[in-house]
């Protein structure tokens, strides 16, 4: 009988193995297969945004100045959406709109679709990066799952919402003041603050902030092996074998404060994951609803009574009037291509006037 010793090895020159070895080897900045999507898309998205905010005007799409070159600052510069007449065109540089002319492409708003699409794929690449690294070091993939929340919000707001409307024009432009304008637009045209999905989103984000503050303070409060003298940084010593904080003490403290407390670390940290991610997903679902022009809560009985009785008004009816004002004043400013002119007598006024 013949016994063969040693291991069977594949052909060393296999292209996939060579690429896999190079992409996933241990280095200061991990690349990975996900990096083939992440790094180019992130580079182009950020590069497009810096280019647009520095040099490109929004005069031809919105009738606005939007670049540092025109006098804007960091808060007012933006990469603005294409004109409404371009609908949902991808606005490729070589497409029928720009016909390979880079200057014309920028004037038409081509940088917005460029930044939006590369940004979306860059975020997806970052989530895949977390999956890939988690698999490499044998972790659960909850980081990647949690990051699906911001991705869902980005995709719903910047892509799905304008796809449900008449064009990319109604998406947010990429800038601070531009996002504020979009928020006012959402309130005036969709009554977004009274939408239950927005309420769940606010509860999730603010609830997560509260949980983070409570959790961080509690762990700091219950650290032990805390060093000697004024130096407290030994609490973070990575070579300390045992735990650095007391879960039992934390449980007793919050049991006395609230009457209830987490007794299990896994449930506690899952809850801290669940609250913000669920909130972000609910917000994203709500924005998808707005893309289809679904309405928020309507308390019609209060509106009818307020219209009939000058002395009856609620915070809801006042908000409805404010929304009408936003629509009337904003539409003419925000959609100059419609040539909207509202006479004074049709502009909304509250009962107090």
From Swiss-Prot:
Its EC number is 1.10.3.9. The modification Phosphothreonine is found at residue 2. It catalyses: 2 a plastoquinone + 4 hnu + 2 H2O = 2 a plastoquinol + O2. The D1/D2 heterodimer binds P680, chlorophylls that are the primary electron donor of PSII, and subsequent electron acceptors. It shares a non-heme iron and each subunit binds pheophytin, quinone, additional chlorophylls, carotenoids and lipids. There is also a Cl(-1) ion associated with D1 and D2, which is required for oxygen evolution. The PSII complex binds additional chlorophylls, carotenoids and specific lipids. It is a multi-pass membrane protein. PROSITE patterns: REACTION_CENTER (PS00244). Fe cation binds at residues 215, 269. Chlorophyll a PD2 binds at residue 198. This is Photosystem II D2 protein. The gene is psbD.
């Amino acid at each position: 009988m013949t016994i063969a010793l040693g291991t069977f090895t594949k052909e060393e020159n296999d292209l996939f193995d060579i690429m896999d070895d190079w992409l996933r080897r241990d280095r200061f900045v991990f690349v990975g297969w996900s990096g083939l999507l992440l790094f180019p898309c992130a580079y182009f998205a950020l590069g497009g945004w810096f280019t647009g905010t520095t040099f490109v005007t929004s005069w031809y799409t919105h009738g606005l100045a939007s670049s540092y070159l025109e006098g804007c600052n960091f808060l007012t510069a933006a990469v603005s959406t294409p004109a409404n007449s371009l609908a949902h065109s991808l606005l490729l540089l070589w497409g029928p709109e720009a016909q390979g002319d880079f200057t014309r492409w920028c004037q038409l708003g081509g940088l917005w679709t460029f930044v939006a699409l590369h940004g979306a794929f860059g975020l997806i690449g970052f989530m895949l990066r977390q999956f890939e690294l988690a698999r490499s070091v044998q972790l659960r993939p909850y980081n990647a799952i949690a990051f699906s929340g911001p991705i869902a919000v980005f995709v719903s707001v910047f892509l799905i919402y304008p796809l449900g409307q008449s064009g990319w024009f109604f998406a947010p432009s990429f800038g601070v003041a531009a996002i504020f304008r979009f928020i006012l637009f959402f309130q005036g045209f969709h009554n977004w603050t009274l939408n239950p999905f927005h309420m769940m989103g606010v509860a999730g984000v603010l609830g997560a902030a509260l949980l983070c503050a409570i959790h961080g303070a509690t762990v700091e409060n219950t650290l032990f092996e805390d060093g000697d003298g004024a130096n407290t940084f030994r609490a973070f010593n990575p070579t300390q074998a045992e735990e650095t904080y007391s879960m039992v003490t934390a449980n007793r403290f919050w049991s006395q404060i609230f009457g209830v407390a987490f007794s299990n670390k896994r449930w506690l940290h899952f809850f801290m994951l669940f609250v913000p991610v669920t909130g972000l997903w609910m917000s994203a679902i709500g924005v998808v609803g707005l893309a289809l022009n679904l309405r928020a809560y309507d308390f019609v009985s209060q509106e009818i009574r307020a219209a009939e009785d000058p002395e009856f008004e609620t915070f809801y009816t006042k908000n409805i009037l404010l929304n009408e004002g936003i629509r009337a004043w904003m539409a003419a400013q925000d959609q100059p291509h419609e040539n909207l002119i509202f006479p004074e007598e049709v502009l909304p006024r509250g009962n107090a006037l």
